[in-house]
């Protein structure tokens, strides 16, 4: 009827605990890096806007 998983070696072996943790750490590090860049752009962008407004006024 439906397809069943075979044990003929066609499935990927499960990752080790170390590999899973390493992958999760890399993903979290990337997220924090992106978040930090966004925050830096927001903070620095506000300072630039204020300087530009002072020049125009």
Curated annotation (Swiss-Prot):
GO terms for cellular component: plasma membrane. The keyword Flavoprotein does not apply. Residues 16-47 are annotated as: Required for DVL/RTFL small polypeptide activity. It is found in: Cell membrane. Keywords: Cell membrane, Developmental protein, Glycoprotein, Membrane, Transmembrane, Transmembrane helix. It is a single-pass membrane protein. One of its GO terms (biological process) is negative regulation of cell population proliferation. InterPro entries: DVL, DVL_RTFL_regulatory. Glycans are attached at residue 5. It comes from the Eukaryota. The chain crosses the membrane at residues 29-45. Small polypeptide acting as a regulatory molecule which coordinates cellular responses required for differentiation, growth and development, probably by restricting polar cell proliferation in lateral organs and coordinating socket cell recruitment and differentiation at trichome sites. Belongs to the DVL/RTFL small polypeptides family. This is Small polypeptide DEVIL 20. It comes from Arabidopsis thaliana (Mouse-ear cress).
